[in-house]
C-alpha cells in the first residue's frame, strides 16, 4: 500500500460486537423499529379500550410493553448469534487509510476503495464506516492516529463524498430519516 495517511484499530469484545449490531440495526432498521413501536402501542391501547377478560388484557399489555421497551431486541439476537458462531474468537482489526483505499487486516486482509462506503456514522466512542447493511468497519475513536479526530473526519468526508452523522435517538427521527428508512427497506 502507498502512503498511509491514518491508522485505526479495534480489539473486539462481546460489548463491541453487541454495539456493532445495535448500530447496524439503528442505521438500517428504523422503519422496523417504528413498526415495532406502533404495534406495541396498538396492543397496549387494545388492552385498555377493549372489553375482553382481564387475562386477555394482561397478555396484550405484556406483549405491547415488551415491544415498546425492547426496541433493539433483534440486534441483540443477531449479536448473540454472531458471538455463539465465533465461540469467543473475536477479531482484532487494523485499518490503514491510504490515498485511494482503506486496508483492513486482522482475520484476513483486503482493500476497500473509498467510493464503496455508503455511510459514515459516529457515536461517543466509535466510528462506523458502512459499506452496506451487512458490512461495516468499526473502530475506536481514540485509536485514530495521528490523533486529530476532526482532521480524520474531514479526510473521510473528502475521500468518500459523504457526511458524518451521529446516530440520533429514535424519537427524534425527522422526515429525512423516515425517507431514508424507506430507501433502506427497498435496498437503495
Regions found by a protein language model. Name each.
Residues 27-87:
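Alpha-helical transmembrane spans
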Residues 71-111:
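Conserved beta-hairpin
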Residues 102-104, 110-127:
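Phosphoinositide-dependent membrane-docking surfaces
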Residues 128-188:
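A membrane-cytosol interface segment of integral membrane proteins
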Residues 1-43:
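N-terminal membrane-targeting/pre-transmembrane regions
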Residues 96-97, 122, 131:
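Generic beta-strand structural signal
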Residues 109-111, 118-120, 134-137, 145:
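Short, surface-exposed beta-strand-loop junctions and turns on beta-sheet-rich folds
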Amino acid at each position: 500500500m502507498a502512503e498511509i495517511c491514518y491508522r485505526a484499530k479495534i480489539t473486539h469484545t462481546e460489548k463491541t460486537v453487541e454495539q456493532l449490531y445495535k448500530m447496524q440495526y439503528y442505521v438500517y432498521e428504523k422503519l422496523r423499529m417504528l413498526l415495532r413501536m406502533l404495534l406495541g402501542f396498538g396492543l397496549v391501547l387494545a388492552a385498555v379500550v377493549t372489553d375482553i377478560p382481564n387475562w386477555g388484557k394482561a397478555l396484550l399489555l405484556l406483549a405491547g410493553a415488551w415491544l415498546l421497551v425492547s426496541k433493539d431486541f433483534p440486534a441483540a439476537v443477531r449479536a448473540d448469534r454472531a458471538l455463539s458462531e465465533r465461540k469467543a474468537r473475536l477479531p482484532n482489526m487494523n485499518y490503514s487509510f491510504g490515498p485511494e483505499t482503506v486496508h483492513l487486516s486482522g482475520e484476513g486482509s483486503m482493500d476497500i476503495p473509498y467510493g464503496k462506503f455508503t455511510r459514515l456514522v459516529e457515536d461517543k466512542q466509535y466510528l462506523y464506516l458502512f459499506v452496506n447493511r451487512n458490512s461495516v468497519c468499526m473502530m475506536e475513536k481514540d485509536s485514530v492516529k495521528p490523533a486529530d479526530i476532526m482532521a480524520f473526519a474531514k479526510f473521510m468526508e473528502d475521500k468518500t463524498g459523504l457526511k458524518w452523522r451521529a446516530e440520533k435517538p429514535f424519537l427524534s427521527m425527522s422526515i429525512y430519516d423516515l425517507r431514508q428508512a424507506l430507501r433502506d427497506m427497498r435496498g437503495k
